[in-house]
């Protein structure tokens, strides 16, 4: 798992523990997901390049640094990734936003694309793919495939919780994709849920169960 970075921080551990609690309601769950994504983004964006700019302080002129966030593309996987996008956009408000919709066929267990709306992608764009739960890796692998087919070269996957099986699936297919997570959990159960995990993130976010 050489491409995996587990962001080890007391704030993340604290907030993630509250999210795992089955008694945490959807409002707090959404807020915590946004906050943790913001903290993950601090590390996941560390490789972004800065350009020198001249600024004038109240006292004198000096050289500062600026990220060209117009070269950043944020792509949540629908639907649970939507809340994560808000966290990154707080830091990079001028980033473009794309959306990818994927579901898993219950018969074949293969990922099926049902929606994709992406801004123009090229070698210079820094793409951040967002999905709270990296479980089997099927959805993430399919989303990366879609991004690459549309011209993306620099892709970073940001997830809340990952299972070893999901990380290995992504690394096996795409060795150039870095993965940032808040926690690496034990394993998947027979139904493809992460153990201990936090349940179905989409259902808990949008109260659909």
From Swiss-Prot:
UniProt record, GO biological process: UMP salvage; uracil salvage
GTP-binding in keyword set: yes
Keywords noted in UniProt: Allosteric enzyme, Glycosyltransferase, GTP-binding, Magnesium, Nucleotide-binding, Transferase
Binding site for uracil: 194, 199-201
Entry's transmembrane regions: none
Matching InterPro entries: PRibTrfase_dom, PRTase-like, Upp_B, UPRTase/APRTase, Ura_phspho_trans
Ligand binding (5-phospho-alpha-D-ribose 1-diphosphate): 79, 104, 131-139, 200
Catalytic activity from the UniProt record: UMP + diphosphate = 5-phospho-alpha-D-ribose 1-diphosphate + uracil
EC number: 2.4.2.9
Co-factor requirement: Mg(2+)
Keyword GTP-binding among UniProt keywords: yes
Free-text cofactor note: Binds 1 Mg(2+) ion per subunit. The magnesium is bound as Mg-PRPP.
Described purpose of this protein according to its UniProt entry: Catalyzes the conversion of uracil and 5-phospho-alpha-D-ribose 1-diphosphate (PRPP) to UMP and diphosphate.
Recorded family membership: Belongs to the UPRTase family.
Entries under HAMAP family matching the protein: Upp_B
This protein's name: Uracil phosphoribosyltransferase
Naturally occurring in which organism (per UniProt): Thermotoga petrophila (strain ATCC BAA-488 / DSM 13995 / JCM 10881 / RKU-1)
């Amino acid at each position: 798992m050489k491409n995996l970075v587990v962001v080890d921080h007391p704030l993340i551990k604290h907030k993630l523990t509250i999210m795992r609690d089955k008694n945490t309601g959807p409002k707090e769950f959404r807020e915590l997901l946004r906050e943790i994504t913001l903290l993950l983004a601090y590390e996941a964006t560390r490789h972004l390049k800065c350009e020198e700019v001249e600024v004038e302080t109240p006292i004198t002129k000096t050289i500062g640094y600026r990220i060209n966030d117009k070269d950043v593309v944020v792509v949540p996987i629908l639907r649970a990734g939507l809340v994560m996008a808000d966290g990154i956009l707080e830091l990079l408000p001028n980033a473009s936003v794309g959306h990818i919709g994927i579901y898993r066929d219950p018969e074949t267990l293969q990922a099926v694309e049902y929606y994709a709306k992406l801004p123009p992608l090229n070698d210079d764009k820094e793409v951040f793919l967002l999905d709270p739960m990296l479980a089997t890796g099927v959805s993430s692998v399919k989303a990366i495939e879609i991004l690459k087919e549309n011209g993306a070269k620099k892709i970073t996957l940001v997830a809340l919780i990952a299972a070893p099986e999901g990380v290995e699936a992504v690394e096996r297919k795409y060795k150039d994709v870095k993965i940032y997570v808040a926690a690496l959990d034990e394993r998947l159960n027979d139904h493809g849920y992460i153990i201990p995990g936090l349940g179905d993130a989409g259902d808990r976010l949008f109260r659909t169960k």
